[in-house]
Amino acid sequence: MTDAVTSTGIHVLPVTGIPEIHAGDDLVRALVRALSPADGTPGGDLRDGDVLCLSTKVVSKAAGLVIPPEDKQRAIAASTVRLVARRHGARTTTSVVEIPAGPVMAAAGIDASNSPDGLLLLPEDPDAAAAHLLEGITALTGRRIGLVLT
């Protein structure tokens, strides 16, 4: 993105114009469109060396990794490599678990926020998901960038 790296540090710039993503949407094309200037050059706002940070939530939405709320405990159990802790509250119990990709997180990373269709699961292989997105963005823009799933 223009002026993203300077000799004195980095600049963090938001990507605007990404539509609401749904299961089956082409996330690569949506990102490239959002990163394209008014002249329509695909990804024209990207520069070699830029790093795009993208939430796993949007990747999960595009991949259709949605389950109904009543399946939450079953999904946590299926995603658990190791139970790290269990916290009992007044109304709920939260499990902190290690998931197959390696991170340790509450509820196996299952997320209900901004997901009106149900609960979002994390991608099974976030590295492969990031590589797929990066390959697509590079193919459409010709830019050599980095990509981090957050």
Segments and roles (model prediction):
Residues M1-T150:
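N-terminal and secondary-structure boundary signal
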